[in-house]
Amino acid sequence: MSKISQQNSTPGVNGISVIHTQAHASGLQQVPQLVPAGPGGGGKAVAPSKQSKKSSPMDRNSDEYRQRRERNNMAVKKSRLKSKQKAQDTLQRVNQLKEENERLEAKIKLLTKELSVLKDLFLEHAHNLADNVQSISTENTTADGDNAGQ
């Protein structure tokens, strides 16, 4: 199946041309494309939000300028105070965490020492049990030998 297409362009607004394309044998509908016009077709397109922000330079002696500067100075002051407060809060939190860490390390040392003492007691008790079982076993063996001879 061969594809045959034709293009024709119509001049648009603001230096933008619309290209219309007709496609044969495909059955698909083509969407017009917007492309910049050729040389001499106008300047850059400016977004509406940018157009409204253009203003003449302000006079430094005007009330509006002074009010804007005052608001800006207050905002900067507020931002710096907020930043200082955040730094102080962070430093305070760091100190709290250091203290907590020291307490936890001391607790670990104490619990490790307690574990060591309990292990020693357990091993000593286990040794004593083993010695008692062995001595009872030896006595029974000796007593059995004496009873067998009688």
From Swiss-Prot:
One of its GO terms (biological process) is positive regulation of type II interferon production. GO terms for cellular component: chromatin; nucleoplasm; nucleus; RNA polymerase II transcription regulator complex. It is found in: Nucleus. The keyword Flavoprotein does not apply. Residues 28-37 have a biased composition (Low complexity). Belongs to the bZIP family. C/EBP subfamily. Residues 97-118 are annotated as: Leucine-zipper. Keywords: Activator, DNA-binding, Isopeptide bond, Nucleus, Transcription, Transcription regulation, Ubl conjugation. The keyword Glycosyltransferase does not apply. InterPro entries: bZIP, bZIP_sf, C/EBP. This is CCAAT/enhancer-binding protein gamma. There is a cross-link at K3 (Glycyl lysine isopeptide (Lys-Gly) (interchain with G-Cter in SUMO2)). GO terms for molecular function: DNA binding; DNA-binding transcription activator activity, RNA polymerase II-specific; DNA-binding transcription factor activity, RNA polymerase II-specific; DNA-binding transcription factor binding; identical protein binding; RNA polymerase II cis-regulatory region sequence-specific DNA binding; sequence-specific DNA binding; sequence-specific double-stranded DNA binding. Binds DNA as a dimer and can form stable heterodimers with CEBPA and CEBPB. Interacts with ZNF638; this interaction increases transcriptional activation. Residues 27-94 are annotated as: Disordered. Residues 56-72 have a biased composition (Basic and acidic residues). Residues 62-125 form the bZIP domain. The gene is CEBPG.
